[in-house]
């Protein structure tokens, strides 16, 4: 059901932008952006490129990194190394970018709306280094655990305001919703053949505030 709703919204947005397109608009073919985002449990940064088929829609994608803000220190008898306490993921995100015409103009500044539905594709592998304290000191061991599978494809959709300060430059402020789980790979890990998932935060969807710098050429 969620997938059907997601695809329906994407199709409706696409149709609206097609109808809004006019032959008189100046066409820019390429859109590049740098985006930063923050949520309650992670920060994210990404670089994106979209080939604009019209001033209002285009296809492309982004590459980025997301890192958790909450430290995971381990469990009974084992202590996670400092450099492994916060989950971190690289990802690719194919997407459709939609720009609606400016709805407000203040001098030369135009303010409009944008939307960007897409996918978030991660590498289903992560490694945690830890000290095993189950043996008396000084017999502590340096060990590691790694993920085995787990979810790697997630839906996400961005929406917000375009603030055009020049025909080739704008800023955006928006919101991103994603089904991405920052601990997705860690939920498959085991310590002494026992899942560590009960020690991890409850799975939640991602809700972010985003800002970006955008160039058109």
Ranges and model annotations:
Residues 1-27, 217:
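Cleavable N-terminal export/targeting peptides
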Residues 21-29, 55-56, 101-113, 165-171:
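Short loop/turn motifs that connect adjacent beta-strands in outer-membrane beta-barrel proteins
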Residues 24-45, 59-66:
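Transmembrane beta-strand segments that form the barrel wall of outer-membrane beta-barrel proteins
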Residues 30-32, 43-47, 90-94, 153-159, ...:
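Hydrophobic, lipid-facing positions within transmembrane beta-strands of outer-membrane proteins
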Residues 31-35, 76-85, 141-147, 195-201:
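Extracellular loop and loop/strand-boundary signature of outer-membrane beta-barrel proteins
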Residues 37-41, 84-91, 145-154, 201-205:
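Short sequence motifs at beta-strands and strand-loop junctions characteristic
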Residues 51-138, 204-216:
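Gram-negative (and chloroplast) outer-membrane scaffold detector with strong preference
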Residues 157, 162-217:
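Predominantly the C-terminal beta-signal and adjacent terminal strand-loop region
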